[in-house]
Amino acid sequence: MSGAESYRHITVLLNEAVDALAVREDGVYVDGTFGRGGHSRLILSRLGDAGRLIVFDKDPQAIAVAEELARSDKRVGVVHGGFASFQAALDGLGIGKVDGALFDLGISSPQIDDGSRGFSFRFDAPLDMRMDTTRGMSAAEWIAVASEQDLHEVIKNYGEERFSRQIARAIVAQRAESPIDTTRKLAQIVAQNVRTRERGQDPATRTFQAVRIFINRELEEVGAVLPQVMCRLKEGGRLAVIAFHSLEDRIVKQFVKKYSQHAPLPRWAAVREADLPELPLKIVGRALKPGEAEIAANPRARSAVLRVAERTAGPIPEQSQRKTSEWQ
């Protein structure tokens, strides 16, 4: 039995995230990160016969589960691909506006715990790290050709690793002797070049995170999908995003703030804030984190943050609509 099959996947902030969508029985909803379908199944339980749920995932294993669900529930539509193709995928399915969209960002427990996927330094496996194993460059292939500067920048920017330059230099030196094609080889190089260890954290944690984020274009896709969702939400529709680390949460937070709050007016301004045009989003509640009971049951939930925004009647700036074209 593989790690993906043996690990019991626990959906993070299950009720809180679906509650945030305020699901209507006849609504159209999107689960942008199907995983093993925890959020999707709860959404379906609240939809009536006329409702629809479109699910996205890159991972072929997740898509297999989603397609099995779709065979038994005609309300479900499945998209094998990243959520950055949000608008194009909806167009292909003949769907216009939607009532809500949910994104549970980052890597899933089945992906981490399946040693063969190459996401974790806990297993010695081929260094792959692709969420979609059917396309794109693997981590090993990229590490084999990336320049020392590119390695440094990825590890520094996506892993926030203080020793990124030393790690990059060591990778280049080692690959000149033999390929760095397994998780163990990469983890050993990192361990030899991280001078101080963070309490309770393996020295390879930040580097593995950085390479995974880069290989899967995780941050670019988050930045790309948010304006697309804003364009497709009906008035009153909800966007709910669960982030697990500061890089992706910062993107979500800044996006929602930009389109829900006017910049402060100077004291000498002749116009009042109340006279400014309505913005396209409004923040719903405060950022929500898992409670102690959920963290005790699922320690991986500890860093999760849920942010929710609602579409208003405010117009969407033209430049935001243009930004979505790259991913269509």
Curated annotation (Swiss-Prot):
It holds the Pfam family Methyltransf_5. Disulfide bonds: none annotated. S-adenosyl-L-methionine binds at G37, G38, H39, D57, F83, D104, Q111. Its EC number is 2.1.1.199. GO terms for cellular component: cytoplasm. The keyword Iron does not apply. It catalyses: cytidine(1402) in 16S rRNA + S-adenosyl-L-methionine = N(4)-methylcytidine(1402) in 16S rRNA + S-adenosyl-L-homocysteine + H(+). GO terms for molecular function: rRNA (cytosine-N4-)-methyltransferase activity. InterPro entries: RsmH (IPR002903), SAM-dep_MeTrfase_MraW_recog (IPR023397), SAM-dependent_MTases_sf (IPR029063). Its main location: cytoplasm. Keywords: Cytoplasm, Methyltransferase, rRNA processing, S-adenosyl-L-methionine, Transferase. GO terms for biological process: rRNA base methylation. Specifically methylates the N4 position of cytidine in position 1402 (C1402) of 16S rRNA. PANTHER family: 12S RRNA N4-METHYLCYTIDINE METHYLTRANSFERASE, S-ADENOSYL-METHYLTRANSFERASE MRAW. This is Ribosomal RNA small subunit methyltransferase H.
